[in-house]
Design a protein with these regions (language model features):
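N-terminal regulatory/sensing modules of transcriptional regulators
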Residues: 1-26
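A broadly conserved detector of short glycine/acidic/proline-rich loop/turn motifs that flank catalytic sites
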Residues: 7-9, 22, 47, 82, ...
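Short, structured patches in soluble enzyme cores that scaffold and shape functional sites
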Residues: 20-22, 125, 133
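Conserved binding/recognition cores within well-folded domains
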Residues: 26-124, 128-130, 150
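Solvent-exposed, charged/polar functional surfaces in cytosolic regulatory/catalytic domains
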Residues: 88, 138, 142
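C-terminal structural segments of small proteins and small subunits
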Residues: 131-133, 137-138
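Short, charged, intrinsically disordered terminal tails
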Residues: 141-150
Length: 150
């Protein structure tokens, strides 16, 4: 692989061009990795600001008008409101689980039905979350589970 960087002070936006014989899985992974830098999210913890990638986030929760980001190892606070995260991360596999939470589908280990049409998610951290009946259908649809599968 050959990498060339051209610096141009008149450039307004970073542009990356890939020259290859054929677009294969390795190229697609590189593109996905590059795009993830554009979707970096900031969170604060102990007075420090951290850069978080969507793949590292298990879920985002709103508590007392504050927004918290949960990863496998830490909890961060972030200024955007929950609906802003939902809109921004929808293409990254995030979905609304309740009025107060947005979950990363990649962070879900398993799910099972619960009373009243709700779902219980087990996250990769072992933590359990409830998907309200209002949003359970959307989750099933994202997973390709139609009808009475669950």
């Amino acid at each position: 692989m050959k990498i060339t960087i051209l610096e141009d002070s008149s450039t307004q936006e970073v542009e990356i061009t890939i020259h290859c014989k054929k677009t294969d899985s390795q190229i697609l992974r590189m593109i996905a990795s590059l795009r993830s830098f554009d979707r970096t999210i900031t969170g604060t913890k102990d007075g420090q600001t951290f850069l978080l990638l969507p793949n590292d986030i298990l879920y985002i929760e709103s508590v007392d008008k504050k927004t918290f980001i949960y990863t496998l190892s830490d909890i961060y606070e972030s200024p955007p409101r929950l609906y802003e995260f939902e809109e921004r991360l929808a293409g990254d596999g995030f979905f609304r689980a309740s009025k107060s939470s947005v979950v990363n589908l990649a962070g879900v280990r398993s799910l099972r039905p619960d009373f009243g049409g709700r779902l219980i998610l087990t996250l990769n951290s072992g933590e359990k979350m409830t998907v309200s009946r209002q949003f359970a259908g959307t989750v099933k649809q994202k997973l390709g589970l139609g009808g009475n599968t669950l």
